């Protein structure tokens, strides 16, 4: 598996939407990035606010078969974490499953989606969109109603907007996805599990999570299993959480 094309777009509505529209133009794996995304999706229905050149928006499109496609968001969070560490010397924490935090505030968001393509839409692929906050000022997060968001620049990183977006896009392509993807496509999440656990801020903390049948459960997050599920020890036993909202006490204002 190899990423065979990376497209730079001076501006687009959404890199995920662009990849969906042009999915069949890519080979087995392809990527698109921009620093001006004008019609992204705000979290929980919030209005999208364009960072106007101060953030990186990157989407990788995959139509190769994966052993565990549902765990791609976890691999993506590790891929970004590695490259931010190399470039800026920062050690982000991961809030399960795929938010990256720096000093307790969100610096990276990831959204993976399934795609149908080809004759009668019988082909199945997956795309993974990544937004990295590079140099937005505090006023951006205030206007976007994101009290728990931050940027690398606000956290003290030296950002060069003339070179950093391209460097990060190429690094994510070559070292974040291309090389690890050989292992991930064959073996799934298991080879990356220990690295992920060490970076996961949930482990050892009290969490609240959505129950499959409705309602909420709570307990201590104690592990990540080989399928990427968050293992929570509750009063009634262990729960293996894979979907739904998970609040971590002490993070994003959760108590």
Give residue ranges: language-model regions.
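N-terminal lobe of the biotin/lipoate ligase/transferase fold
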Residues: 1-90, 106-108, 115-116, 254-255
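Long, positively charged amphipathic alpha-helical accessory segments at protein N-termini or as interdomain linkers
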Residues: 65-67, 74-92, 102-255
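Basic side chains
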Residues: 41-46, 95, 197, 206
């Amino acid at each position: 598996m190899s990423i065979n094309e990376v497209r730079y777009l001076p501006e687009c509505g959404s890199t995920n939407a662009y990849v969906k529209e042009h999915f069949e133009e890519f080979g087995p794996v392809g990527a698109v990035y921009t620093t001006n995304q004008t019609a992204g999706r705000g979290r929980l229905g919030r209005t999208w606010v364009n960072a106007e050149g101060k953030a990186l928006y990157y989407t990788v499109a995959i139509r190769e078969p994966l052993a565990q496609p549902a765990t791609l968001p976890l691999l993506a969070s590790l891929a970004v974490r590695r490259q931010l560490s190399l470039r800026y010397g920062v050690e982000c924490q991961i809030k399960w499953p795929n938010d990256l935090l720096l000093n307790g505030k969100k610096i990276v968001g990831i959204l993976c989606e399934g795609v149908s393509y080809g004759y009668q839409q019988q082909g199945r692929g997956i795309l993974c969109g990544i937004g990295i906050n590079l140099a937005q000022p505090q006023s951006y997060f205030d206007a976007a109603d994101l009290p728990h968001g931050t940027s690398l620049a606000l956290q003290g990183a030296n950002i060069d907007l003339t070179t950093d977006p391209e460097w990060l896009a190429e690094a994510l392509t070559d070292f974040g996805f291309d090389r690890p993807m050989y292992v991930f496509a064959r073996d799934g999440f298991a080879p990356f599990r220990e690295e992920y656990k060490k970076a996961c801020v949930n482990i050892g903390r009290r969490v609240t999570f959505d129950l499959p049948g409705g309602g909420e459960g709570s307990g201590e997050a104690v592990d990540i299993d080989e399928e990427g599920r968050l293992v929570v020890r509750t009063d009634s036993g262990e729960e293996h959480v894979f979907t739904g909202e998970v609040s971590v006490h002490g993070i994003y204002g959760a108590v």
